[in-house]
């Protein structure tokens, strides 16, 4: 099993993507530490928690730095150094025109999607330094790569998350730690339900996207889980600071051409000059 004797911390494991990722790492032999927020424990309790000593569950609000520190410390005491961090905690935030957005809700979105990611990475890095290795996988989204009207908090937080990932990759390149971000595609999830409930507030583009999702059933969460496993494995060594689409990028074929990718601007946020 590829991840035997490895410890994986999954932030936001009670969602559809987080649950699929947790199951995947468990099957590959990892020690799996899972976090959930408030009411979303039940689904986890019925699944992985019944599978024995390689699984542990922690309640966590990523907006609280001291709580993040405490959970990371508890994971270290139970399982030892953390080798893999997967941060798939996130919210869609306010949907609609920015001038009507709740200031509290807008800022809360930034806190969870961006600041929470910083807190978790900041807390886990010393453990990875001690282990002498590490893989960090962040979850971004379509709002990071292009403007997303009526979802300004979400798109701003996800774009910032990608730039955070790119910048940190450079800091960590001599530490044997790689960090990348995933765009999972339209997975059927809690966000999908929130988008439907918003009606026309998200604009015509969102309405059309929702219709397409309903027709196709969306992207399976297992697709994002498979990419997560790849990025956490030795097969992705050297690949860092990239935003990779689980759906549109041919990441299954990338292992042999990682040096080529890393010598280019592929899968990064860049300003496109006028020719």
Q: Can you name each region flagged by the protein language model?
A:
Residues 181, 201-274:
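C-terminal helical subdomain
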